[in-house]
């Protein structure tokens, strides 16, 4: 099956959209890990997690974003980010808070991948052929 590559505009739009979760997950995770650990610990206990869970969760968050950023492992990264964001949705639902943000992030993860890799188009068709 021959696949035509995505247009230049679609590929670049995919890279830009994909950069949003990568930046938030990796750079944000590193920032919170090294510079705002007290704030993260407070947030974790607010949601019912033990304070000791903050660092392992951040350490798990950072590689998910990095794996997604690498084209050869982007699919695995998208799956890992989806699982991570599913946990975020569950946490917000359990706390009775809005859970819109992690869902939007998940949509951005898959939309970015869909735009830059044509192999996902048959799996997630936006229109009938």
Language-model features: locations:
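Extended, low-polarity transmembrane helix blocks
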Residues: 1-28, 70-129
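A generic alpha-helix surface/boundary motif
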Residues: 37-38, 60-62, 84
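Hydrophobic alpha-helical transmembrane segments
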Residues: 1-7, 46-56
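Solvent-exposed, well-ordered loop and adjacent helix/strand elements within mature globular domains
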Residues: 26-53
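Short hydrophobic/aromatic segments of transmembrane alpha-helices and their interfaces
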Residues: 23, 48, 57-59, 102-103
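Core segments of alpha-helical transmembrane spans in multipass integral membrane proteins
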Residues: 49-69, 76
């Amino acid at each position: 099956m021959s696949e035509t590559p995505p247009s230049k505009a679609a590929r670049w739009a995919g890279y830009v959209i994909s950069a949003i979760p990568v930046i938030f997950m990796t750079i944000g995770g590193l920032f919170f890990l090294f510079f705002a650990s007290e704030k993260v610990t407070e947030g974790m206990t607010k949601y019912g997690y033990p304070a000791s869970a903050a660092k392992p969760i951040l350490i798990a968050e950072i590689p998910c974003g990095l794996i997604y950023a690498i084209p050869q492992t982007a699919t695995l990264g998208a799956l890992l980010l989806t699982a991570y964001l599913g946990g975020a949705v569950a946490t917000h639902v359990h706390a009775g808070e809005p859970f819109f943000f992690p869902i939007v992030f998940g949509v951005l993860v898959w939309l970015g991948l869909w735009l830059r890799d044509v192999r996902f188009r048959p799996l997630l068709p936006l229109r009938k052929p």
